[in-house]
């Protein structure tokens, strides 16, 4: 992220032009404001303190939901949402950097500097979403961005536009109250894909090219975890094993070498490996079991049943706990595939599509302790310490930049990527309060005993 202030990459204009559809200026449907008034009543904003406005938090989340930012879509995926957020951050007086992390994939980073020296805390999130699928499977418009019965509804409401709105307004609240150190607010591209935004951010941080940021001492990833404080996350490996033989007529299979039986042998070997890993390491108390799951098989032409294929490729989704060394596991699987191919007279190629190691931030790390304190301050109860079943951008920030991360955000763990996605307004506001308290604890130190 070269340069300073509001910068660009790949020719991006430093200051986005106003959106012709009114993204930056148009209000959310008036029903949202009315519903908020009814839902929040006299407490509207009171629980957030004078530094923040409850309605503004939900209004921003609703605006973001109304923007269709599907990560598999053509062209500029995050652009409209990034433009909205960048404009708001500039209004707050932050130093703003907008970059194209990959072609058509926009990220925005806002930096807020305190009034005295101190540590640097990062809030991190994303605005790309998975597809809504068949709209007929929804009972409402997937991009409604409305509040009904105390719930903000629509694709991306829980995962994780509510979390983005909460972290932006939490940082603003801390800014207005004064603080030590620095807050970095990063909305990074392509989390639902290969996490290209987080990878680019980590590279730029290592190169020292992020304006105003020379280090980051802790990261709060604002993904939906049902209000649990999650310092651990499963690792993930996306793997393809391609066996290569020789094509032949189905009537004369001896004229070729069929790779499909080798796939069957590999499937059995994967099951054996999973059994050994589970027997050796057991279930993780917060993450559950290690899983090696075959997900895709590509071989032959479905219209040519009489042709023996030359190649067969197996895709495997692997989920690990901190007990598993990915390098050792991948070496074992490569040896296994090689033996199977040799015995069958085949060629083989093992491709690691992506390798995301587990995250295991110590509970006594200051960023975890700050988030625990923030939850306690916001809710009056101790937080449940949990684990993230999938990978987040925090996985990449830990792997590539060595950053300590903890995941905490509004919305249920299991509602993401489903039809009729929603998040409770009360949970959005509780998360905002928790972020404010966590940031103050991390940056200023714990409050003095009364």
Stretches found by the model and what they are:
Residues 2-5, 11, 21, 25, ...:
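Acidic/His- and Gly-rich active-site-bordering loop/insert found
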Residues 2-4, 43, 47, 76, ...:
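Metal-dependent amide/peptide-bond hydrolase catalytic core
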Residues 124-125, 186-188, 220-223, 242-244, ...:
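Short beta-strand segments
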Residues 132-147, 216, 231-242, 406:
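Acidic-glycine-rich active-site phosphate/pyrophosphate-binding loop
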Residues 152-165, 172, 191-192, 257-260, ...:
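Short, conserved micro-motifs enriched in small and acidic residues
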Residues 148-150, 170-185, 212, 270-280, ...:
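Phosphate-handling active-site elements
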Residues 97, 119-123, 186, 218-220, ...:
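Hydrophobic/aromatic beta-strand patches that form the interior of the parallel beta-sheet core
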Residues 160-238:
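Acidic/histidine-rich catalytic neighborhood of metal-dependent amide-processing enzymes
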């Amino acid at each position: 992220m070269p340069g300073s202030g509001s910068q660009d990459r790949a020719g991006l204009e430093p200051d986005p032009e106003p959106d012709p559809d009114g993204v930056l200026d148009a209000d959310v449907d008036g029903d949202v404001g009315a519903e908020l008034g009814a839902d929040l009543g006299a407490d509207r904003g009171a629980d957030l303190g004078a530094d923040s406005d409850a309605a503004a938090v939900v209004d921003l989340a609703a605006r973001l939901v109304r923007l269709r930012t599907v990560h598999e879509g053509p062209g500029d995926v995050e652009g409209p949402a990034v433009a909205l957020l960048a404009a708001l951050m500039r209004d707050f007086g932050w130093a703003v950097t907008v970059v194209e992390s990959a072609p058509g994939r926009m990220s925005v980073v806002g930096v807020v500097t305190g009034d005295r020296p101190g540590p640097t805390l990062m809030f991190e999130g994303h605005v790309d979403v998975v597809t809504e699928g068949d709209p007929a499977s929804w009972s409402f418009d997937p991009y409604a961005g409305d509040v009904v019965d105390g719930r903000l509804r629509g694709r991306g409401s829980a995962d994780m536009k509510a979390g983005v709105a909460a972290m932006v307004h939490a940082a603003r609240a801390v800014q207005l109250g004064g603080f030590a150190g620095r807050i970095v607010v990063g909305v990074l591209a392509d989390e639902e894909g290969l996490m290209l935004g987080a990878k680019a951010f980590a590279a730029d941080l290592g190169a020292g090219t992020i304006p105003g940021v020379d280090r980051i001492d802790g990261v709060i990833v604002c993904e939906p975890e049902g209000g649990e404080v999650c310092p651990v996350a499963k690792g993930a490996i996306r793997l393809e094993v391609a066996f290569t033989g020789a094509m032949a007529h189905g009537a004369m299979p001896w004229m070729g070498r069929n790779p499909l039986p080798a796939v069957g042998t590999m499937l059995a070997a994967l099951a054996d490996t999973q059994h050994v890993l589970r027997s050796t390491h057991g279930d993780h108390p917060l993450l559950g079991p290690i899983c090696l799951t075959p997900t895709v098989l590509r071989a032959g032409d479905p219209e040519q049943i009489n042709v023996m294929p030359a190649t067969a490729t197996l895709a495997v989704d692997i989920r690990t706990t901190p007990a598993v060394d990915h390098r050792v596991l991948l070496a074992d699987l490569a040896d296994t595939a090689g033996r199977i191919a040799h015995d069958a007279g085949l060629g083989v190629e093992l491709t690691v599509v992506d390798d995301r190691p587990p995250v295991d931030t110590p509970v006594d790390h200051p960023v975890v302790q700050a988030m625990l304190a923030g939850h306690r301050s916001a809710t009056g109860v101790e937080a449940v310490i949990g684990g993230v079943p999938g990978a987040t951008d925090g996985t990449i920030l830990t792997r590539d930049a060595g950053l300590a991360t903890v995941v905490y955000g509004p919305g249920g763990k299991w509602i993401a990527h489903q039809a009729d996605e929603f998040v409770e307004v009360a949970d959005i506001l509780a998360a905002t309060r928790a972020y404010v308290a966590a940031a103050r604890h991390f940056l200023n130190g714990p409050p003095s005993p009364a």
